[in-house]
Regions:
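Hydrophobic core segments within long, regular secondary-structure runs in both alpha-
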Residues: 3, 7-11, 66-70, 173-177
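Structured C-terminal helix/loop/strand segments within mature extracytoplasmic catalytic/sensor domains
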Residues: 109, 137-180
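Structural helix-adjacent loops and short alpha-helical linkers that scaffold large soluble proteins
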Residues: 1-7, 56-64, 165
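Alpha-helical scaffold elements that line and support the substrate/ligand-binding pocket
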Residues: 1-10, 44-52, 155-158
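Solvent-exposed, acidic/flexible segments
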Residues: 3, 38-42, 169
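Penicillin-binding protein/beta-lactamase superfamily catalytic region
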Residues: 19-152
Length: 180
């Protein structure tokens, strides 16, 4: 059902170049994962990015509800560890910084006004404040370093493929923001 729905409602309307493969939850149940495990090529992944960049619209046809797309990259869990993750997208795209108190955070923000703060969280263990910055983008990450990045503020998408996970996506996104 999920694979058929995805094929009919998304894959075919977007004119994807190749069939995707979808991971199953287990050999026993064989239920398609809808939360991850989608394997496709770079062009088809870019089409998904374009779909989200255009708020669910593909060449004048609304494929995904605009309200759902907006919710997909809006913060959900203020103050929790999942504060930058929503509907399979990450939106704290620039950097994390830690501050001992709120005043230090305010001073940093005054010094760097272009660094938009997406959310702040206070650590229960250390009492530090973590500020997660945002520059208009959101991204999805694959298991081995595949990344689909969408920046609605600057109107571009980027697809990264890799064989290994890398932990410096935020640095790459920050540099792209400055270049584009």
């Amino acid at each position: 059902p999920y694979a058929e729905y995805l094929s009919e409602k998304v894959w075919k309307p977007l004119g994807m170049e190749q069939s995707a493969s979808i991971s199953l939850d287990s050999k026993k149940h064989r239920i398609a994962k809808s939360y991850g495990g989608l394997t496709t090529n770079v062009r088809d992944l870019a089409k998904i990015g374009r779909l989200y960049l255009n708020k669910g619209n593909w060449n004048g046809v609304q494929i995904i509800d605009t309200a759902f797309v907006e919710r997909s990259h809006t913060k959900k869990y203020i103050g929790s560890n999942n504060g930058t993750y929503s509907y399979n997208w990450y939106w704290g795209t620039t950097d994390h910084r830690y501050f001992k108190d709120k005043e230090s955070l305010r001073q940093y923000y005054k010094a760097f006004p272009s660094m938009k703060i997406a959310t702040t969280m206070r650590s229960n263990k250390t009492g530090d404040y973590a500020a997660i910055f945002h520059r208009g983008g959101f991204w999805a990450e694959g298991l081995y370093g595949q990344v689909l990045y969408v920046n609605t503020e600057k109107n571009y998408i980027a697809v990264f493929l890799g064989a290994d996970r890398i932990e410096d996506y935020c640095y790459v996104f920050d540099r792209l923001y400055e270049i584009v």
